[in-house]
Amino acid sequence: GLGDVYKRQDGTLLNSKHEISEKTKNVLIRAIKEGHKVVIASGRQTAGIEFLAKKLEFHIHGGLVSGFNGGQIKDIKTGEIISNHTMDINLTKKIIDFSKDLDIEMMIPHEGKIYTNKKGQFYTQKEADILGVSLVIEPNLKDKINFPANKFLFAQTPEKIDSPAMKLYEEFSDVTEQVKSTRYYYEIMPKGLS
């Protein structure tokens, strides 16, 4: 409802040092104790933002994290996944296969890890480091993957990203949502999310 508090992780919840300020932390904890629902929302995977929920004492007082651009919502106090939108496993495999020869780094965030089919030049390791998750490099990922993806994250330099992104768009735009989220990131999500 109108009394609920929603905070995006990137740019609004965190200060320039990528931390929650004491003032913000105290205001949000007070709001939770007063009965307001507080949600931390991010395009990142749920596991990559749970450390923020811990700092806001969601595990004690309650609160939700919304990852993957709303594709997965988790109640931190109970551990329950309330909502989970994925692309089916066949589509997940098709995107992996199609993207393998493109000049772009491919990442699939899942349960505290980032899966990729080859070590990237820069972005895959950087993304894993930022989130504090492990990087799983599996050259035969298309055949080995056993879960449907919540999201694909593709990365490349700003000068080179548009060509492979356009090929992905042309191939999969009818069955997925796609967005260039930064100058160097291109995302593919289940239809209906953005």
Outline where the language-model segments fall.
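N-terminal G-site helix/loop of the GST-like fold
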Residues: K7, N15
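Conserved residues at the C-terminal ends of beta-strands
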Residues: R8, F68, A155
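Active-site phosphate-binding/coordination module
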Residues: E22-Y123
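Short, small-residue-biased leader/transition segments that mark boundaries at the very start
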Residues: G1-Y6
